Each structure stands twice: as C-alpha cells, then as structure tokens.
C-alpha cells in the first residue's frame, strides 16, 4: 500500500491597511492544485481579479475570510487589527492547514506553524489567491458602502486617501466607517 501524505498549506493576505475608511479584510486559502494567473492582486485589473476569484472559490480545497471592523482598528491599531483579522480567516477555514504562509513581515498568533514572507503575494500561489479574494470582497463592500454613505466616492477610491476623498471628508465630515485614529480623520475631529 502506497500512502502519500499531503501537507496542507494555507496562504493568508490582507487588504485595506491604508484606507481612511472601511474594514481590513483578510482571506485564507488552501489550494488543491495550481491555478494559472495567480499573482499579487495589485498587479491585476479588476476584471482579471473577479474572474480569478470565481476560479479560486470553485477550485480551492478551502477558503475563508476574516475581518477587523473600523472600531477594532481604532481600538487596537491597524497592525494588531490586521493580525486579528488574519487569525480569524485561518480559524474560519473548514479544513485545518498544517502550515500557514502570510504575506508581509509579521504573523498572527496561531496554534499552527506560521511563516511571514515579504512579497509573498507575488511568490506563493496560496497567498496570491488570498490576496485576490480579500481584494475582491473588500472592493465589493466599499461599492455597497458608497450607496449607504453617498458623497464620499467610496466606490471609486475604496476608502484610500485620494484628493477626492479628502475633499469629501472636509466637506461632509467623517461618517460611521471612517477610521477615527487615522489622519486626516483624527485631525478633522480634533478641530
């Protein structure tokens, strides 16, 4: 009897550390087999990301999302909130991985061996897949939030500190999904 032991590896990445508004969203992905076209989500067009996200969801052995809400970001800081969201994504996987690879320089606290890989979203297919899923989900959320909080342009800039967003922030003031701990939101509140 020939038994092959397959090590299950999860890739984890985040989207939304830098924006002035919205949650930080993470994904964890365990792939069954390689998927052509996987790379860092920032190197793909929205159309390419959306098509790959469909394939990842169909072909991955498992995937899950994690998040840290604006209140958690403001309370913990973005670094700790991101690690919390990463842990939530891994813990939400329906299958427990043997190893976890995380994009970046830091790893969340897990009861599984975990390694941080700088630029992992360009190097490790599982991290690339996680990058794509997290980006597509967060972008969809920001488009939906644009309808709830009109005037800020969330559908276009996804909460990042663009000139249009800063101008809207000055004109309208912060809304519920703005990160109070982030400048220029904090600067505006303190005036």
From Swiss-Prot:
Manganese or magnesium. Binds 1 divalent metal ion per monomer in the absence of substrate. May bind a second metal ion after substrate binding. Disulfide bonds: none annotated. A divalent metal cation binds at residues 13-14, 103. It is an enzyme of class 3 (hydrolase). Keywords: Cytoplasm, Endonuclease, Hydrolase, Manganese, Metal-binding, Nuclease. Residues 7-191 form the RNase H type-2 domain. The keyword Nuclease applies. Gene3D superfamilies: Ribonuclease H-like superfamily/Ribonuclease H (3.30.420.10). It holds the Pfam family RNase_HII. It is found in: Cytoplasm. Coiled coil: none annotated. The keyword Manganese applies. Its cofactor is Mn(2+); Mg(2+). GO terms for biological process: DNA replication, removal of RNA primer; mismatch repair. NCBIfam families: PRK00015.1-3 (NF000595), PRK00015.1-4 (NF000596). Belongs to the RNase HII family. This is Ribonuclease HII. It comes from Legionella pneumophila subsp. pneumophila (strain Philadelphia 1 / ATCC 33152 / DSM 7513).
